[in-house]
Amino acid sequence: MAKLSKRAAAIAQKIDRTKLYPVAEALTLVKETATAKFDESIDVAVQLGIDPKKSDQLVRGSVVLPAGTGKSVRVAVFAQGEKAEAARAAGAEVVGLDDLAEQIKAGQMDFDVVIASPDTMRVVGALGQILGPRGLMPNPKVGTVTPDVATAVKNAKAGQVQYRTDKAGIIHATIGRASFGIEQLQTNLAALVDALQKARPAAAKGIYLRKIAVSSTMGGGARVEIASLSA
């Protein structure tokens, strides 16, 4: 516990939780306090001006981060015939249909993303109770149910992240690693914010981007001055 307290004290000295920082400074501070022995993830939380209780104001989608996520992603694809071949050629680790479904039912899920061709949903739909709680259920809103499975595989490998509002109307996403440069993190954050702006529900009123904060896995969190994102 002493080490944690020491770390917390060091973070508190560097980052003022009441202050809004220009985006580059916020990311710099978060990187400086990411002192764990592993390559910490850099995460962002975005408070949106929506009513999360209303279904027409939920925000969900995906975006390919220009600088990637720094994570190696294993992809499973439900497809047959030419689409299955295209998925393999694009780099999918696991491709199948009934055999893949049986593998999942047996608890063998050594993958991070599941993609499905629309014609396989009769099989995939029956796996909802297994894939859903793990955040793996394919969904057309995030581009994981698509006839173009090859492009979906390439996007997943290139650093695509999925996002959706939680019960408090907050989006949580990873925008890179502590080893990333400030410019890479800033570019990824800008891409995410741009995607969120484009996904703004028509029913959302008032200020849409309410608060943005960046943090690392074990380090501190810093609030971002939203105006600095477009500066």
From Swiss-Prot:
Q: Could you confirm whether the keyword Transcription regulation appears in this record?
A: no
Q: Which GO terms describe its cellular component?
A: cytosolic large ribosomal subunit
Instruction: Give any single GO term for biological process.
Output: translation
**Keyword Cell inner membrane belongs to the record:** no
Taxonomic placement: Bacteria, Pseudomonadati, Pseudomonadota, Betaproteobacteria, Burkholderiales
Which PROSITE patterns does this entry report, sorted A to Z?
Answer: RIBOSOMAL_L1
The record's listing under Gene3D superfamilies reads:
3.30.190.20, 3.40.50.790
What does the record note on quaternary structure? Part of the 50S ribosomal subunit.
* Coiled-coil features, chain-numbered ranges: none
Annotated GO molecular function terms are: rRNA binding; structural constituent of ribosome; tRNA binding
Q: What is this protein called?
A: Large ribosomal subunit protein uL1
Entry similarity comment: Belongs to the universal ribosomal protein uL1 family.
Cited function? Binds directly to 23S rRNA. The L1 stalk is quite mobile in the ribosome, and is involved in E site tRNA release.
What's in the keyword line of the UniProt record? Answer: Repressor, Ribonucleoprotein, Ribosomal protein, RNA-binding, rRNA-binding, Translation regulation, tRNA-binding
Query: Entry's HAMAP family?
Result: Ribosomal_uL1_B
InterPro entries assigned to the protein according to its UniProt record, in alphabetical order: Ribosom_uL1_bac-type, Ribosomal_uL1, Ribosomal_uL1-like, Ribosomal_uL1/biogenesis, Ribosomal_uL1_3-a/b-sand, Ribosomal_uL1_CS
